[in-house]
Amino acid sequence: MTQAFTVVIPARYASTRLPGKPLQDIAGQPMIQRVWNQARKSAASRVVVATDDERILAACQGFGAEALLTRAEHNSGTDRLEEVASRLGLASDAIVVNVQGDEPLIPPALIDQVAANLAAHPEAAIATLAEPIHEVSALFNPNVVKVATDIDGLALTFSRAPLPWARDAFARDRDSLPEGVPYRRHIGIYAYRVGFLADFVAWGPCWLENAESLEQLRALWHGVRIHVADARENMLPGVDTPEDLERVRRVLGG
């Protein structure tokens, strides 16, 4: 029997490129409702929206979602997740999945996969997903986070830089992906053991996390194991810009 898990969807109103992003309309529904709908299709026993904004809270209550108003001063999404897990009274060995509030096309199967992977790997406190990189432009794009793992699928590191750097191959040609190097893009969905979250918050950011702006590096810095599996379904891009929003509107608007 699969271990039960809770989905938490962080949703902040502030956004540099798209203010009020969670409330942007997509084919008659606010974006946060679209994300909530996808999460509800997963095997999660509970789906909770975590927001620091009264407008988002009211919208969620309007379409029947369970939602919590959190503190506004959290340093990261994981810090916000810890507050929610504590307020919900989740057991230390419970699993919580963090689904980003700007992923209205997230496949429910990936939510189930990342939760099941964590349950199957007791040596890890976090599980996440990745997919192959097929274009050299993605490898050199700092917005595409790369991940390298060991033989057991545990993360060695994450970086916005090309990882690993194929020295000899790139000395000859930087316009093609080197053969024999399994480059992978990190997909930003996480499952956590609740007991780990308090440690994560207590540690505070480390210099490596700050340099890359990747909070998962805080866990690796402290020796925490992160299991990384290849996603079973394609993860369609989320919404970061007005152009992304129009693309998703076309997909969901028919």
Curated annotation (Swiss-Prot):
Chief subcellular location equals cytoplasm
Q: Name one GO cellular component term.
A: cytosol
Role summary: Activates KDO (a required 8-carbon sugar) for incorporation into bacterial lipopolysaccharide in Gram-negative bacteria.
CDD domains given for it? CMP-KDO-Synthetase
Location relative to the cell: Cytoplasm
Transmembrane parts of this sequence: none
Reactions catalysed: 3-deoxy-alpha-D-manno-oct-2-ulosonate + CTP = CMP-3-deoxy-beta-D-manno-octulosonate + diphosphate
Q: What is this protein called?
A: 3-deoxy-manno-octulosonate cytidylyltransferase
The broad enzyme category this protein falls into is transferase
Might you give the EC number(s) for this enzyme?
Answer: 2.7.7.38
Q: List the disulfide bonds.
A: none
The record ties this protein, via InterPro entries, to: Cytidylyl_trans, KdsB, Nucleotide-diphossugar_trans
Among HAMAP family, the record links this protein to: KdsB (MF_00057)
The alphabetized UniProt keywords are:
Cytoplasm, Lipopolysaccharide biosynthesis, Nucleotidyltransferase, Transferase
Identify the coding gene.
kdsB
The GO molecular function terms of this record are: 3-deoxy-manno-octulosonate cytidylyltransferase activity
